[in-house]
């Protein structure tokens, strides 16, 4: 290969070598609580500033306590691939040295009730609280007292001195847990936190979502978002060409530019425009083609397809619209981080049924 050709190929090869884009989101809980091994299931702490895990001393009737915490991971777009998960809890009180605490994936839904516990012993349960026996006091039960969860820990961590965040580092199982919640949101019940139980003191106090913002539980999720994906069927135009939608770049809430939604193989020197919606895809017959975007739709500015100059009549036309410019303009508040957008081109085709053409469509998410 000549040096000149090699030089021309270098930018292309560099683009091909770029790693897949990764995004990171930090989330706080949607619910957390402590349950206590009260044999009649009448003890909990749902709305307190702190939660507890491990074994307390013998001066209490219910020494074993377990903390539960769940996070809404819907900020990670559906179809994403999770690559790393870290779980962070702020530990604010202990009377023992370092102990190992584990996270276990919960397998049954539970409710964060109204009860506030003002100490490590919690308080009497009220309707809607979780307890050692109940997912929802006092008429919905765990299958197994103490909570239904996967026996094998998703992560473990030695926790020692107070007044600091402790981070369970990413493990294959933590990644699998969060991936399963993204793929199947109805199974997202969170984790239960356990310390050594049944023997010597081991209990630790952690801050909850009701605490000050700087102490609240967190998860940090790193993920590879799904690429823009073409779907639906384009209407064949009057010359027998099938327009094809495409894109370069990605929809970025903060970029300001750099996400071109394109259309090729369309009629030359014709008016057209990109339209879009945020309520998902559709497959409805429309003007001899298919409406691929769920109403209501929004239109962008009209363009000319260019291509061969008149009087030529061919399929050398094309369109391009930088969607990041629209996002950055703030003209549509629905174009927010994590939003699914579906987009499609409409263009003039004077010799076709209804004198119009509809392309196939593109679905994509807006990333932070």
Task: Tell what function each PLM region has.
Residues 225-368:
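Residue-level hotspots within well-ordered secondary structure
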Residues 22-74, 197-200, 210-216, 220-224:
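Flexible, small-residue-rich N-terminal segments that precede or flank a structured functional core
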Residues 94-180, 298-304:
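Beta-strand-rich interaction/scaffold domains
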Residues 64-66, 76-86, 254-257, 267-270:
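Extended extracellular/luminal ectodomain segments enriched in beta-structured repeat modules
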Residues 74-78, 92-95, 107-114, 175-176, ...:
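Acidic glycine-/aspartate-rich tracts in secreted/extracellular proteins
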């Amino acid at each position: 290969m000549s040096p000149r050709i090699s030089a021309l190929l270098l930018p292309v090869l560099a683009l091909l070598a770029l790693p897949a884009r990764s995004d990171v989101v930090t989330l706080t809980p949607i619910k957390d609580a402590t349950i206590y091994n009260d044999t009649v299931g009448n003890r909990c702490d749902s709305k307190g500033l702190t939660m507890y895990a491990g074994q307390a001393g013998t001066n209490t009737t219910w020494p074993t306590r377990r903390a539960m915490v769940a996070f809404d991971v819907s900020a990670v777009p559906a179809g994403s691939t999770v690559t790393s998960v870290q779980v962070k809890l702020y530990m604010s009180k202990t009377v023992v040295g370092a102990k190992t605490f584990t996270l276990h994936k919960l397998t049954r839904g539970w409710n964060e009730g109204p009860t506030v516990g003002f100490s490590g012993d919690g308080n009497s349960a009220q309707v809607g609280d979780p307890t050692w026996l109940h997912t929802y006091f006092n008429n919905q039960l765990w299958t197994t007292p103490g909570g239904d969860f996967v026996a094998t820990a998703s992560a473990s961590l030695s926790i020692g001195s107070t007044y600091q965040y402790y981070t369970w580092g990413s493990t294959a199982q933590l990644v699998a847990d969060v991936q399963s919640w993204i793929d199947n949101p109805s199974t997202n019940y969170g984790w239960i936190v356990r310390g050594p139980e049944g023997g010597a003191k081991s209990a630790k106090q952690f801050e909850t979502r009701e605490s000050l913002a700087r102490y609240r539980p967190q998860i940090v999720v790193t993920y590879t978002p799904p690429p823009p994906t073409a779907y639906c069927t384009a209407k064949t135009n009057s010359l027998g060409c099938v327009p094809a939608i495409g894109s370069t770049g990605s929809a970025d809430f903060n970029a300001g530019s750099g996400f071109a939604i394109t259309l090729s193989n369309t009629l030359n020197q014709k008016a057209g425009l990109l339209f879009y919606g945020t309520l998902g895809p559709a497959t409805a017959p429309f003007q001899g083609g298919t409406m691929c975007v769920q109403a209501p739709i929004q239109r962008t500015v009209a363009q000319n397809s260019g291509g061969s100059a008149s009087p030529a009549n061919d399929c050398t036309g094309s369109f391009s619209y930088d969607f990041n410019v629209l996002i950055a303009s703030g003209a549509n508040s629905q174009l927010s981080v994590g939003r699914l957008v579906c987009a499609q081109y409409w263009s003039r085709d004077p010799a076709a049924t209804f004198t119009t053409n509809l392309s196939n469509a593109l679905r994509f998410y807006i990333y932070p």
